[in-house]
Each structure stands twice: as structure tokens, then as C-alpha cells.
């Protein structure tokens, strides 16, 4: 407290002493009065004094005010006065002091009083509990006080809230408050709470903050809303920026789709309010947070795809091509579109198809390039267009080819009715504006980045300099302008273009060296002792000459690697050359450009280096330095080693391709096996259905048998009078004929059964022979399992067939028994001595029963015939199943042979790869002995790839 009293020590003592006594008396009343009204009035008086006499009230009353919060929670009025007083003490928002240093002193007071307040973490917990009160006069001052604490000392207050039970959840309830002022101040509170604290950001996000904030933005009118929309957008940025977990949660929650209505602008775009411009600017920044190049590539790619699928990219392109858009919004929209399409092939293809609403329509890329090479356009807009063009070409070989194609003679519009991207780049490259030269050179370099094919294609470009003079190549024209001594920005841009063009392209190096004036110009530039401004150009010239040495294929006799190194040693000196080469990476603007891809410069004179070029310098600086110090013998040995390694790589690639082909063949064979299994299952299903049908016929036959037995019983009991009228012998003879027919059918069925038995014996013998052959053959581990499955299926089919045969035999036996009973009935002798009347009655009854018996016998014959036909159909299906099994056995034998051959080929490949690895190790050891560095990571990566392929081969053999 003594320290706090010393802050205001320079003030006069008279009136302040009186006020200090008043404050002391009020504090005594708050502490000692037993009446609630007295305490309330005292706290209200302290509140009125707290703004003007902040220091005195803070020193004397803070403890008493905290005690009031603890003991008088039942009275909302005194709680509200106490919270307002504490807010006035801690907050720096409202000041009435007029001294010069009042602002600095008030900030110190606020942080010091905040430190005193949070020294006891229970005070913050008490404040959080007060926020649960629904009373407006308690909740709103509590929100303001907690916000002020977070602004003064954010990290310690955040930590206290984080460890407090349900602390963050209580604050999230503020967003659902129906009173707008509390809800809006709750948004400000969450802004301060989530600033630079990833743990709290995650908790807030999982407390459904995204849903609530987006609802508020929609209710307020999206971009047409007021400052509440701005506050919500700032809070969303706090939650998403550099927080990969929340970004993934935002994408998977389908919240990206809800951003599309933000960018729906009408046809009338004039007269935008300042708040709308601010809101839309923050919305665009929020989109960029989700697709920032600094995010993990996988997360960025998924967000880019989601933005295309929901139409957000299309909406941004509409703003891009609209008229009447404010300049800063247009610039930020270009930057946003740039990062949405960067490295995403689908988005890049869509952007290439966008046309500007002009007559005739022009591609959006052409319209943007026209702005980039126009020196009257704002500098930030030109930088944004360059960034957009770079992002369009990033990892986009198709787009690179389309841009380079517009420079080739076959694609140039002879009528001159339309302007192509290539023509605009050439126009900017040879313009009198140095910034246009730099932008066009960097843009063209990005069209060649990592694309050897387009580097060779660009060598075909011919330029007509003037009427009557022959055309010159683009490469030659660049070197001509370089030698004319133009502005530094122009020369730096051309040198970056040439370095990108010649790197990893020996053909371009040959074309460059073919002009005899280029090498003397470079050596002359490097050898001179110039000022600091020219040192950067000297470093770039040294880099270009080093690239011409490192990527030289020695096709030009006068400019081989050895002769160029001798020239450097003679005219420049190796140490001097390496020193000049090091000027590039030591430059201040080089380190600034290497930090992020976006070309963001405060003014045009800082626009020197490109981000992708800094990566190229980092890659080539070391290898060029080593190449300069190498002798000719080392170069020859290195070339031999490179050739050997290339041959080895070709061999390994060839065998890898062979192994891949064999893997594909094995996969096809596996698919065939699975198809045959499916067919076998279908056959089993058919057999099951047939078995069920046989069971049905068997049941019907049993029913007929029972009925026939009853009829025979009645016929035996009444057969005594059959002979009286002479009818019984005729009927018996007819029955015997029917029985003979049944016997013939039985014989036919027995013959078919014998054929089936012989077929089963043949199948058993073939199965035994197949098992012996399979036992002697060497098959992959999985083939015996497949064969065993097929055998089990065959055994099941045979068992079903045997059961069906037994059932047919049983039916035949029962049929024979019925025939024997019929014959017994036919042989029975009638009894004499009955009267004619009784005989006539019995004869009539027997005739009726006999006719019924004949009818039943006829139906039985029909059923037996149907069973015979059904059995024949089953026999045919079984024959087809046997043929299918034979085909499967044949296919399996073929698979055995093919897998055996594949195993032998893979064994040969493994032996060959082992020999090649041994050769590589010996070559590496020789290289190390010669002092040549060996890239361990690449080689280990290749070895891992080889090991992976060998492991895959072993797995296939296991299959």
C-alpha cells in the first residue's frame, strides 16, 4: 500500500486530506455498521468518489468491498454498488484526471490494483459465482469487472478461471442472455478470455461457441450488422487462429457452409458504410485463417475443398469480378481467393474458368494481370494480384503449361482481338516501370517453378524487337536488358527469373552459355568492387554463374564445367566468388521474404526477393560452393557415380514395376477365386432348395401310402363276394398289370441309382488322386486352405446325395411292400355258401371300394412318375455341380503353377536387388573416400522403399 500511496505523492495535501478522511469514515461505516442501509449508503458514496479519487478509494476500500461481496449477496443493490466501485478502481477506460502523465499512471494503477485483487484467487471465483445471478444490476457490473481484470493481467486471470470448476461454462451462458447489453459485453469478455490461451479456446469451442456466435451474426444481419458482428468475428478469429483442433472442429461441424451468406453482395455496391467494410474485412480474414499456408497441409486442403463444395469460393470470385467494391475489400478478397486456391487442383481449375463480366468476356487471370502490370494501380493491389497468380501456379503443372502456352507462337492470336496472359507478362517484363518488370519476372518464374518441361518449352519463345530485325529468343532478350544496366529492381527480377529457369534444366543452361556475351558479363559484374546496392546484384550473378556450372552437361566445348571454374579462379578467385554468393542470404530483405509466401512489403523499394526464390537459394548455395572447389577428376568420378546410380535407379524402377504388375496379377487371381466361391455358394443354395422339394414330395408320398393302406384293409375284409358276379378276376388282372408297370419303373429307378453309385465312386477316386497330387505339390500357404474348403463343400454335396439316394431306396422298399400286399389280395380265394342277396350286396360294396382303390393307385402312379422326373432333374443339377467342381480344380491347379512361378521370379529379384545394394554401398564408400558428400536421407529413403517392396513381395508369397 505504501508503494501505491507514493504514486500520487506529488499532489497537494489540503483538500485531499479531507477527502482521504471522508473515504476512511465511509470505509469504517461499511466495516462496522450493523444496518444494511448504512452500509449500502456508504458503498454508494465510495462509488461516487472512486472515479476522481481512484487511488485513495482503492487503497482504503478494496478489502471492505470484497467483504461486502462475500457477506451481503442477498442484497443486489449493495452488490451492484460494490462491483461498480471495484470497476472504477481497476479499469482504465474512463479518466477524469488532467495531468500529462495521467494515462501512464492510470495504467500502472489498474494493473497494480488488479494484482492485489487476484492475489487471492477466491476473489475471482467469487466474481464468477456472482455472474450466475440473473439480476441485471449484478450480472452486468460483474461482466464489466471481469473483463477489466482480463485486460489488465490476462494470463494469471485466465489461469484462475481455467482451474475454477465450471468457470468457462458460466461465462458461456452470457451469450444466451436475452438482454443484448449483457450478451454483447459477454462477447467482449470472451475476447479477452480467449486471447493467446489455447486451452481456454478449446473449452469455449466445445461449449458450442461457434453455433452461438454464428447465430448472433445472422441475427444482426451478417456484413450489414453493427459493431456486435465485428466483436463476434474478432472472437471467432481468437478461437481459430493457430488452433488446429478448433479449425478441424469448425470444418467438421459444417460451419464453413454458414459463412457463404456473409459474402452475398447486391448489384448496388456504392456507398458502403465504414462498419460494413470493417465487418467484411474481418470475414475475409476469418476465411484466410482457415486456409493459411502456415496451417498443417491436410487441414488446409480439407477446408479448401469444403469451401469449393459449399460455393464459398464461387461467391468470393463474384466479389472479385464485381464493380463498385471498395479498394481495401477488393485487395483483401484477392488475397483470400489466393489462399483458398493455393495448392488445391480443383479450386485452381475453377479459378481458371472464371471470366470477368466484360464484352467480350475475359478470363479473370488476364484481368488481374492487367492490374498487376499497370503502374497506376495501388501498390497493395498489385502485390495482391501477384500473390494470387503465384497461388494459382503453386503445385499446378496444368496451369503452368497453360500460361507458358500463351507465349508460344502457335497459340498467339494473330488477329490481336484478345490479350493473353503471356502477352501481359512479356509487356510487363520489358516495361519502363521497374515494379512491373519485377512482378512480371517473378510471375513468369512461378510458371517455371519445378517444371522442367515448361522450362524447355519457354526456350521456343521468340520476340520481334523491331521491324526488319530478326526475332530473338526470350532468354536472349532477358540477358540483353540485364546487360543494359537498368534499375536494381529490374535486374534483380530478371536474375531471379534466369536462375529459376536454368536450375535443374541442362538444356536451358546450354542455350544460355551459347551466347558468348553472357559469361563475360557475369564475370565482369562479379569481379567489380561496387557499392552496397550493387552487392546484391553481384551475388545473384554469382548464383547464376554457379547454376551454369552445376547443371552443365558439358555439351559446349568452350564452356564445360572445368573451363568455367578455371575462368572463375583466374578472373574472380574462388574465395571472392563464394563471398559474393553469400551476399544473397545475408541480405535483410532476404530473411524477411523467406518468412511467408505472401509478398507483403511496406513500399515498392522493399520489393526485392520472392519467397520461392529464397528456398531455391537455400537449396543451391551449398552445392554450388562444393562444385566450385571440386577438381576435374572429382567431377568425372562424380559423373560416373551419377550414371551408375541412374542405371541402378532404372533397374530398381524396372523391377519395382514388375513386382507391381505381379501384385496386380495376384489380385486378379484372388478375385477369380472369390468369384468361384460365390458360384459354389449359389450351387449349394440350389441343392438345399432341391432337398427341401424332395422332403415335400416325401411327405406327400407318406400321405398317399397311409391312404392306400386303409383302402387295402377295407378291400381284404370285403373281398369274399368278389367272385360271385365274375368281376373280381378282371379287376385283379388289371391290378396285376398296374403292378407290373410299377415294377418296371422300379427297375428303371434302380438302374439310375446304380449309375449314381458308380458316379460317386468315380468322384471318390478322383478326390483321392487329387489329394495325393496336392500333397506332393508346393503351394502357397493359402491354396491348401482353399482346396480344403472346396473338398468340404464336395463332401457335403456327396453326403446330401447319399441321403437322397437312401430316401429313394426306402421309398422303393415301401413301394414293393405295397405291391406284395396287392398280390396277396389278388391270390386270396373267396368263401362259398353265402346267399345270393348277401353276395350281391357285398359285390356292390366291393366294386365301389375297388374302383376307389384303382383311382388311388392311378394317383400313386402319377406321384411316382413326378418323383422320378424330379430325381432326374436333381441328377442333372448334380452333374453340373460336379463339372463346376472340376473346373474349380483346374483353375486351382493353374493358380498353383502361377504362384510357384511368381515365387521363383521374386526370389531372383531379391538376389539381384541384394547384389545391386552391395554395389551401391561400395560406390558410396568410394564417394566418401573421395570426399564427395552422400545424401544419407535420400538413400535411406530409397532403401526404405526397397525394403517396403521386398516386404510386400514376402506378403504376396505368404498369400
Curated annotation (Swiss-Prot):
Annotated spans, Disordered: 925-959
Keywords, comma-separated and alphabetical: Acetylation, Coiled coil, Cytoplasm, ER-Golgi transport, Golgi apparatus, Membrane, Phosphoprotein, Protein transport, Repeat, Transport
Subcellular location: Cytoplasm, Cytosol; Golgi apparatus membrane
ARM repeats, residue ranges: 20-60, 61-121, 123-163, 166-207, 208-253, 255-310, 311-354, 363-408, 420-459, 473-513, 518-571, 573-630
Highest rank taxon of the organism: Eukaryota
GO-annotated cellular components: cytosol; fibrillar center; Golgi membrane; perinuclear region of cytoplasm
Compositionally biased residues, Acidic residues: 935-959
Stretches for region Globular head: 1-637
InterPro entries: ARM-like, ARM-type_fold, Armadillo, P115_Arm_rpt, Uso1_p115_C, Vesicle_P115, Vesicle_Uso1_P115_head
SMART domains listed in its UniProt record: ARM
Coiled coil residues, start to end: 638-930
GO BP, sorted A to Z: endoplasmic reticulum to Golgi vesicle-mediated transport; Golgi organization; intracellular protein transport; regulation of cellular response to insulin stimulus; secretory granule localization; small GTPase-mediated signal transduction; vesicle fusion with Golgi apparatus
Primary localization: cytoplasm
Post-translational modification (record): Phosphorylated in a cell cycle-specific manner; phosphorylated in interphase but not in mitotic cells. Dephosphorylated protein associates with the Golgi membrane; phosphorylation promostes dissociation.
Positions carrying N6-acetyllysine: 202
Residue numbers bearing the Phosphoserine modification: 50, 940
Membrane topology note: Peripheral membrane protein
Function: General vesicular transport factor required for intercisternal transport in the Golgi stack; it is required for transcytotic fusion and/or subsequent binding of the vesicles to the target membrane. May well act as a vesicular anchor by interacting with the target membrane and holding the vesicular and target membranes in proximity.
Domain notes: Composed of a globular head, an elongated tail (coiled-coil) and a highly acidic C-terminal domain.
Subunit structure as annotated in this protein's UniProt entry: Homodimer. Dimerizes by parallel association of the tails, resulting in an elongated structure with two globular head domains side by side, and a long rod-like tail structure. Interacts with MIF.
Family: Belongs to the VDP/USO1/EDE1 family.
PANTHER family linked: GENERAL VESICULAR TRANSPORT FACTOR P115
The protein's name in its UniProt record: General vesicular transport factor p115
Protein species of origin: Mus musculus
Taxonomic lineage: Eukaryota, Metazoa, Chordata, Craniata, Vertebrata
Amino acid at each position: 500500500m505504501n508503494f501505491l500511496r507514493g504514486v500520487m505523492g506529488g499532489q497537494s495535501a489540503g483538500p485531499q486530506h479531507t477527502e482521504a478522511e471522508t473515504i476512511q469514515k465511509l470505509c469504517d461505516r461499511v466495516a462496522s455498521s450493523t444496518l444494511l442501509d448504512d452500509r449500502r449508503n456508504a458503498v454508494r458514496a465510495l462509488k461516487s468518489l472512486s472515479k476522481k479519487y481512484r487511488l485513495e478509494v482503492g487503497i482504503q476500500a478494496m478489502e471492505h468491498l470484497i467483504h461486502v461481496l462475500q457477506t451481503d449477496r442477498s442484497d443486489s443493490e449493495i452488490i451492484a454498488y460494490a462491483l461498480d466501485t471495484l470497476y472504477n478502481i481497476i479499469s482504465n477506460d474512463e479518466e477524469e484526471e488532467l495531468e500529462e502523465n495521467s494515462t501512464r499512471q492510470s495504467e500502472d494503477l489498474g494493473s497494480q490494483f488488479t494484482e492485489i485483487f487476484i492475489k487471492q484467487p477466491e476473489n475471482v471465483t467469487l466474481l464468477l459465482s456472482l455472474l450466475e445471478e440473473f439480476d441485471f444490476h449484478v450480472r452486468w457490473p460483474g461482466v464489466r469487472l471481469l473483463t477489466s481484470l482480463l485486460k489488465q493481467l490476462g494470463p494469471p486471470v485466465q489461469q484462475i478461471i481455467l482451474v475454477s470448476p465450471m468457470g468457462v461454462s458460466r461465462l458461456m451462458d452470457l451469450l444466451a442472455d436475452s438482454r443484448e447489453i449483457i450478451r454483447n459485453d459477454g462477447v467482449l469478455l470472451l475476447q479477452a478470455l480467449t486471447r493467446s490461451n489455447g486451452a481456454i479456446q478449446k473449452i469455449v469451442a466445445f461449449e458450442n461457441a461457434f453455433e452461438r456466435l454464428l447465430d448472433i451474426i445472422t441475427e444482426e444481419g451478417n456484413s450489414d450488422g453493427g459493431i456486435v458482428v465485428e466483436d463476434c468475428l474478432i472472437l471467432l478469429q481468437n478461437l481459430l487462429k493457430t488452433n488446429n483442433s478448433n479449425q478441424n472442429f469448425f470444418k467438421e461441424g459444417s460451419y464453413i457452409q454458414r459463412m457463404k451468406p456473409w459474402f452475398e453482395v447486391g448489384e448496388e455496391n456504392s456507398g458502403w458504410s465504414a462498419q460494413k467494410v470493417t465487418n467484411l474485412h474481418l470475414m475475409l480474414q476469418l476465411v484466410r485463417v482457415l486456409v493459411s499456408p502456415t496451417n498443417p497441409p491436410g487441414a488446409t486442403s480439407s477446408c479448401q475443398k469444403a469451401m469449393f463444395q459449399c460455393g464459398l469460393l464461387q461467391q468470393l470470385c463474384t466479389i472479385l469480378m464485381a464493380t463498385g467494391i471498395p479498394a481495401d475489400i477488393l485487395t483483401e478478397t484477392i488475397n483470400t481467393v489466393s489462399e483458398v486456391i493455393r495448392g488445391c487442383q480443383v479450386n485452381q481449375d475453377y479459378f481458371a474458368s472464371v471470366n470477368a463480366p466484360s464484352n467480350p468476356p475475359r478470363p479473370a487471370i488476364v484481368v488481374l494481370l492487367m492490374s498487376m502490370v499497370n503502374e497506376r494501380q495501388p501498390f497493395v493491389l498489385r502485390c495482391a494480384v501477384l500473390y494470387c497468380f503465384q497461388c494459382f501456379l503453386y503445385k499446378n503443372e496444368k496451369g503452368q503449361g497453360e500460361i507458358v502456352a500463351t507465349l508460344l507462337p502457335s497459340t498467339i492470336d494473330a488477329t490481336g482481338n484478345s490479350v493473353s496472359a503471356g502477352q501481359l507478362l512479356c509487356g510487363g517484363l520489358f516495361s519502363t516501370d521497374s515494379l512491373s518488370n519485377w512482378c512480371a519476372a517473378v510471375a513468369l518464374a512461378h510458371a517455371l517453378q519445378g517444371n522442367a518441361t515448361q522450362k524447355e518449352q519457354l526456350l521456343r519463345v521468340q520476340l520481334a524487337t523491331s521491324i526488319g530485325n530478326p526475332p530473338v529468343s526470350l532468354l536472349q532478350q532477358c540477358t540483353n536488358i540485364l546487360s543494359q544496366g537498368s534499375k536494381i529492381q529490374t535486374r534483380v527480377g530478371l536474375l531471379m527469373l534466369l536462375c529459376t529457369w536454368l536450375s535443374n534444366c541442362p538444356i536451358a543452361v546450354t542455350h544460355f552459355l551459347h551466347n558468348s556475351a553472357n559469361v563475360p558479363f557475369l564475370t565482369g559484374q562479379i569481379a567489380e568492387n561496387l557499392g552496397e546496392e550493387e552487392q546484391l546484384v553481384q551475388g545473384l550473378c554469382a548464383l547464376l554463374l554457379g547454376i551454369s556450372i552445376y547443371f552443365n552437361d558439358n555439351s559446349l566445348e568452350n564452356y564445360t564445367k572445368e573451363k568455367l571454374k578455371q575462368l572463375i579462379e583466374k578472373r574472380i578467385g574462388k574465395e571472392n566468388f563464394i563471398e559474393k554468393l553469400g551476399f544473397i542470404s545475408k541480405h535483410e530483405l532476404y530473411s524477411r521474404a523467406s518468412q511467408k509466401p505472401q509478398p507483403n512489403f511496406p513500399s515498392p523499394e522493399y520489393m526485392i526477393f520472392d519467397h520461392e526464390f529464397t528456398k531455391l537459394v537455400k537449396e543451391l548455395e551449398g552445392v554450388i560452393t562444393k562444385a566450385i572447389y571440386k577438381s576435374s577428376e572429382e567431377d568425372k568420378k562424380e559423373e560416373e557415380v551419377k550414371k551408375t546410380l541412374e542405371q541402378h535407379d532404372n533397374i530398381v524402377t524396372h523391377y519395382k514395376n514388375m513386382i507391381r504388375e505381379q501384385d496386380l496379377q495376384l489380385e486378379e487371381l484372388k478375385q477369380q477365386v472369390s468369384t468361384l466361391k460365390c458360384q459354389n455358394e449359389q450351387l449349394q443354395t440350389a441343392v438345399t432348395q432341391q432337398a427341401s422339394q424332395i422332403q415335400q414330395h416325401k411327405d406327400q408320398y407318406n400321405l398317399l401310402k397311409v391312404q392306400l393302406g386303409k383302402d387295402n384293409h377295407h378291400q381284404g375284409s370285403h373281398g369274399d363276394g368278389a367272385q360271385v358276379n365274375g368281376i373280381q378276376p378282371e379287376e385283379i388282372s388289371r391290378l396285376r398289370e398296374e403292378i407290373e408297370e410299377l415294377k418296371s419303373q422300379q427297375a428303371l429307378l434302380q438302374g439310375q441309382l446304380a449309375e449314381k453309385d458308380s458316379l460317386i465312386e468315380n468322384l471318390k477316386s478322383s478326390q483321392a488322386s487329387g489329394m495325393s497330387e496336392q500333397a506332393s505339390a508346393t503351394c502357397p500357404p493359402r491354396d491348401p486352405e482353399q482346396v480344403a474348403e472346396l473338398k468340404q463343400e464336395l463332401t457335403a454335396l456327396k453326403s446330401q446325395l447319399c441321403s437322397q439316394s437312401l430316401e429313394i431306396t426306402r421309398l422303393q422298399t415301401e413301394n414293393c411292400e405295397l405291391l406284395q400286399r396287392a398280390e396277396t389280395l389278388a391270390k386270396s380265394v373267396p368263401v362259398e355258401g353265402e346267399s345270393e342277396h348277401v353276395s350281391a350286396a357285398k359285390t356292390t360294396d366291393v366294386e365301389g371300394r375297388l374302383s376307389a382303390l384303382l383311382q388311388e393307385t392311378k394317383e400313386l402312379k402319377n406321384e411316382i412318375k413326378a418323383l422320378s422326373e424330379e430325381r432326374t432333374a436333381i441328377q442333372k443339377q448334380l452333374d453340373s455341380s460336379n463339372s463346376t467342381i472340376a473346373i474349380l480344380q483346374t483353375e486351382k491347379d493353374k493358380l498353383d503353377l502361377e504362384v510357384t512361378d511368381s515365387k521363383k521370379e521374386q526370389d531372383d529379384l531379391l538376389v539381384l536387388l541384394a547384389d545391386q545394394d552391395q554395389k551401391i554401398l561400395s560406390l558410396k564408400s568410394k564417394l566418401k573416400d573421395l570426399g564427395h558428400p552422400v545424401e544419407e536421407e535420400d538413400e535411406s529413403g530409397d532403401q526404405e522403399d526397397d525394403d517396403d517392396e521386398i516386404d510386400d513381395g514376402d506378403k504376396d508369397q505368404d498369400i
